[in-house]
Amino acid sequence: MELNYNRVELRGVAEDAPLLSHVNHGCAFYRFTLSVLRLSGQADKLPVIVPRPLLLLTPVSPGDGVHITGQLRSFNNKSGQGSRLVISTFAQTLTHDADEPLNRIFLSGVLCKQPALRRTPLGREICDMILAVNRRYGRADYLPCIAWGAVAQQVSLLHTGARLTAEGRVQSRVYSKTENGVTTDRTAYEVSIMRPVDRTEFPE
């Protein structure tokens, strides 16, 4: 059984029309934002990268209900503008689907730095970590993850290089950053770990 695992499944509403993101090995890839409602009523605004052949089979317009399966990917942004680590969902399947919102991810990888346990101003425990999930051909995705409460305490006991296998959801979070006296709003994307699991629980 392959130890590394990365599978995300999303169902939500397209916020915008797909725009060309980049071309790789002659294949064009497009980017759009998928809005996925939480139970609280707040929505996660998640960037999706989709190959052109999938878009030709299933065109996407703003307001369309969309179901996606794929992988959560990271890209090291060396332009000096925006986030240094760019996180997006790479779509491997794409269909029209207006059913209930869905947001879940299954990951198995290794911790590439020591988990950091801290308390929020309201006294709730939270643990930050970076999970490295290997792809084929020697590449890896470095995925920011957070855990809360009892799960935060549990994963904080792990050390760099330890394997973490977990189920969670992908979330967006808006924060403010001040540079040279100018404050701007930015959006971070991360995995909220719901529970550690056994690898045998994952869909194949």
List each model region and its residues.
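Single-stranded nucleic acid-binding surfaces, predominantly the OB-fold ssDNA-binding core
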Residues: M1-E204
